[in-house]
Design a protein with these regions (language model features):
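Conserved strand-to-helix beginnings and helix N-cap segments that scaffold or border functional pockets
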Residues: 30, 152-153
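Short, flexible active-site loop motifs that bind/organize anionic cofactors or intermediates
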Residues: 2, 23, 109, 113
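Active-site metal-coordination/substrate-binding segment of hydrolases
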Residues: 65-142, 146, 153-158
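Acidic/His- and Gly-rich active-site-bordering loop/insert found
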Residues: 3-103
Length: 160
């Protein structure tokens, strides 16, 4: 278990840690798309990917909650890729090295990817939870927010 996975809420930090291990630079989101679709498949959740690369994962309502309005959670997959000049790091292949320093989650020598990795982690934690009654859930993960909002502008018809 990584240091950040000991933080609360545990599921959110567990998924954030997993996300930091998946390279996800803008316009190169293939690995995080595979992670998201594997997440959905392993939990028997409905998912769909559009031609732009956006992914939506749906979770049916809890029994008795089917008539509640759907809740949509949205986050983007890509991250700002910046590193310190003295750091040897490849954002297309290397996992982010995280640590806790003075109560803050930080990355070693690179950007952390919390925008919007923590949003993705929160959405995955909600999808993973079975202990909270809920109406229909849809979690939308868009591509290339950091360099052009490509996913938002190219959202496939009928995705939501």
């Amino acid at each position: 278990m990584s240091e950040i996975e000991s933080l609360d809420p545990r599921d959110v930090w567990h998924f954030f840690h997993e996300i930091t291990q998946v390279p996800r630079p803008s316009k190169r989101e293939e690995k995080i798309i595979a992670y998201l679709t594997d997440f959905a498949r392993s939990r028997n959740l409905e998912y769909r990917k559009d031609s732009t690369g956006n992914v939506v994962i749906r979770k049916a309502a809890s029994p008795g909650m089917e008539n509640r309005p759907a809740v949509i959670l949205q986050s983007h997959m890509d991250m700002v890729c910046e590193k310190n000049g003295d750091v040897n790091f490849n954002f297309e292949t290397d996992p982010i090295r995280t640590r806790i320093e003075e109560g803050w989650v930080k990355a070693t020598g690179t950007t952390l990817g919390a925008d919007c990795g923590i949003g993705m982690a929160a959405a995955l934690a909600v999808l993973n939870a079975d202990d909270v009654p809920h109406g229909p859930l849809e979690c939308l993960f868009t591509v290339d927010e950091e360099t052009g909002l490509t996913g938002a502008f190219g959202l496939g018809e009928g995705m939501l």
